[in-house]
Design a protein with these regions (language model features):
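Positively charged, polyanion-binding regions of nucleic-acid-associated proteins
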Residues: 286-318, 326
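Conserved AAA+/SF3 P-loop NTPase catalytic/coupling segment centered on the Walker-B
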Residues: 159-182, 214-221
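AAA+/SF3 P-loop NTPase mechanochemical coupling elements
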Residues: 150-156, 190-208
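Conserved catalytic/switch belt of AAA+ P-loop NTPases
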Residues: 175-197
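Phosphate-sensing "switch" segment of ASCE/P-loop ATPases
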Residues: 199-202, 217-286, 290-291
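P-loop NTPase catalytic core of nucleic-acid-dependent motor ATPases
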Residues: 46-162, 174, 225, 229, ...
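Intein modules and their embedded homing endonuclease domains
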Residues: 1-67, 73, 103
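Positively charged interface segments
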Residues: 145-146, 193-194, 220-223, 229-247, ...
């Protein structure tokens, strides 16, 4: 209040008349004591569900555009043939995922869309579509730290965010914080000069990058839906001119109307179709010990010197633990695996047991079964 009063100190308003003449007050002081001043005893919230309470001030101001009947085929073609590379199953999921985020902006996304593609392929254009719909409640984050570290007051009124050229793989702390941001219904709001405050989170997230390894994806990953964006329109300025005319014109309003009417009553966003990009992210996210196991399984060779293939030596179903430890040690040196990520003999034995269901003796299964595992 004091800062606001200082700002308006030179702005006066007539509040009455005395014998000596008109009386004046500072704008803020006059407003504070006015009988028609609106008072919100319930405080300030951000709730896109549209709750109306005269005692609560809701920071959600609604969508940025109004729906309009008509065709949105330009935008739909972009989503199907560029974002989803023509895959109908992926396209159906993305449409319902977008419809959910638009129809239920009050709900946390729970699944982040991950788009990997070459520069100029159109990855960021999806963000422009959502920016037109959500307006000030949309954010483009050009620094991953804006999402996972430091002050984050900018996220309080955000329902849809795009993390541009963001890579979250390889940093356990950052990866863990990101997963929490995607699924947690609350977040700790940190503002400079204020205590940390727990507030509801409404965030739905898209991550875009041209890096090979973007996210740490586990074998049973359910927080990400990764897609490789098609490069078919790179350099086609006419295509993107037409697309942006649609986004900045009335067609986006037609798309908004379609999304608001889209049937998602039976849509489970946590059940996603398989994608090649998910398998790629999972392979790149394997722990070094699992990467080593994949390497020897694919090579059919468990010998310590990984680079000297001996074609005449058959796959051995029985190998000594010493040989396996030696083989893994060579792999760690060749790949420059950090000490933190290395496993000892006992941990390696436990990993083999968990993969191949063997106890006491660490026998490898036949080559085909090992590759399958």
């Amino acid at each position: 209040i004091s800062a606001c009063r200082d700002l308006m100190r030179n702005q006066m308003i007539q509040t009455g008349v005395k014998a000596s003449g008109a009386t004046y007050k500072n704008h803020l002081d006059a407003w504070m004591v006015h009988s028609d001043r609106r008072t919100y005893k319930g405080g300030v919230i951000f709730d896109p569900s549209g709750v109306e309470d005269p005692d609560i001030y809701n920071l959600w101001s609604g969508y940025a555009i109004e729906p309009l009947p008509g065709s949105c085929k330009t935008i739909l073609r972009f989503l199907r043939h560029v974002i989803c590379s023509g895959n109908k199953q992926h396209y159906d999921y993305v449409l319902k995922w977008l419809a959910r985020s638009i129809q239920r902006p009050q709900d946390i996304g729970e699944v982040a869309l991950v788009l990997r593609g070459k520069k100029g392929s159109g990855k960021t254009t999806l963000g422009e579509i959502m920016r037109r719909i959500f307006g000030n409640n949309y954010l483009l984050l050009d620094d991953p730290n804006l999402l996972t570290r430091g002050f984050n007051a900018h996220l309080r009124e955000c329902v849809f965010a795009v993390a541009d050229e963001a890579v979250f793989a390889g940093d356990k702390r950052t990866s863990g914080k990101l997963k929490s941001q995607i699924t947690s219904t609350t977040m700790n709001l940190e503002r400079k000069g204020f205590d940390v405050e727990t507030v509801p989170s409404r965030l739905t997230l898209v991550i875009i990058s041209n890096d090979d390894h973007i996210i740490d994806a586990t074998g049973d990953e359910r927080r990400y839906f990764p897609l490789e964006v098609s490069d078919q329109s790179i350099g086609d300025t006419g295509y993107f001119d037409d697309l942006y005319k649609a986004i900045n014109g009335d067609e986006i309003r037609c798309f908004f109307r379609m999304m608001m009417a889209f049937d998602i009553s039976e849509f489970n966003h946590r059940v996603m179709p398989n994608t090649d990009e998910m398998r790629q992210q999972q392979a790149l996210s394997l722990r070094p010990v699992d990467q080593w196991l994949c390497e020897i399984g694919c090579r059919g060779d468990v010998y310590p010197n990984l680079w000297d293939l001996v074609e005449s030596d058959p796959w051995q179903e029985e190998v000594s633990m010493d040989l396996l430890v030696s083989s893994m040690s060579v792999y760690n040196r060749e790949k420059k695996v950090s000490t933190y990520d290395m496993v000892n003999r006992q941990q390696l034995g436990g990993r083999l047991v968990s993969m191949f269901s063997k106890t006491r003796m660490h026998n490898l299964p036949v080559e085909a079964a090992c590759k399958e595992a």
